[in-house]
Amino acid sequence: MTLPVGRRTVRAAWITFDRGRDIMKFYSDPEVLAFARRHDLALVMPHQCPAKDAPGDDMDMDPRHGIGRALFTALEQFATASGHPELSNTKLILLGFSGTGALFAHFVGFASDRVVASVVTNPGHFDPVGIDNVQLSPVARLVPQLIMVGGADRVSGTQRPYDYFRRYYEQGAPWAFVVQNKTPHCCIINTKTFMLGWLDAIIRLRQPSSSKTLRSVDDRRGQKLVIRTCLSDVRDTWGTPTWDVCGAGTQASGATLADGMIPAGWLPSALLAERWRAFVTQPTHETTSLP
């Protein structure tokens, strides 16, 4: 754990779950540290068993089976050791990749009252704890989620994460969907600038505090996102083709979708929506952090 806040009261803990060296960069990145200092966040990075060739089986990503309780126990221990008692019941920002992306989608249903926001990247895991089996209550689906995928992801693909997004977005979830065109199962550090902008907006809306209930998000204001997709020649673990974004924009709430466009979520401001559009329409993204 890192405490950029010093002796100030921690408003929330940003949990970045180790799933390879790319996602681990978030924990020590100077811009992330500055962001945490500005918003009075603690940074926590649980380590996991190796994703490949793990002793025994891979992690069980259902937080009800131990990992959720273990995280809360760790925060209670940090509260005592650090002199920050507020950590014992602090609110959480979640960031996970691949299997831990699926974990942090499930986690929202496990402890929705504690979660400020969940960033779910390239989410996927073995059945029955994959992204397609996440079950969220009407309260849990109102927790903001940022769902990110790679257009050339042969592991988790694009369709299953999108189906998860679409199912709950159509039930009123204030979520956003982001595609990194032609990007394989890796390299989410490329999303850092947009991710920090999104988190900044969500933190300001939800006003996390260990002693207060999180504010809800009013998605009647803001921007509705739409995309046009283009199939690639890559297939995921289940044999489903992946896809990239070949067009993106915004539309008025309640408007009929233009031909070929599908929903891609909601963002709280026009500025953030323009940054999203610029990002998802980039032809390619750097892949300098392959695991």
Task: Give the location of each predicted region.
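Short beta-strand-to-loop junctions in surface cap/lid or active-site-entrance loops
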Residues: 1-10
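Short beta-strand element of the alpha/beta-hydrolase
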Residues: 9-20
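The serine-hydrolase catalytic nucleophile loop
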Residues: 24-32, 48
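Conserved alpha/beta-hydrolase
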Residues: 39-53
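Alpha/beta-hydrolase active-site loop
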Residues: 58-86, 94, 106
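The feature captures the conserved acid-bearing segment of alpha/beta-hydrolase catalytic domains
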Residues: 116-196
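Alpha/beta-hydrolase-fold serine-hydrolase catalytic core, especially in secreted/extracellular enzymes
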Residues: 171-172, 181-291
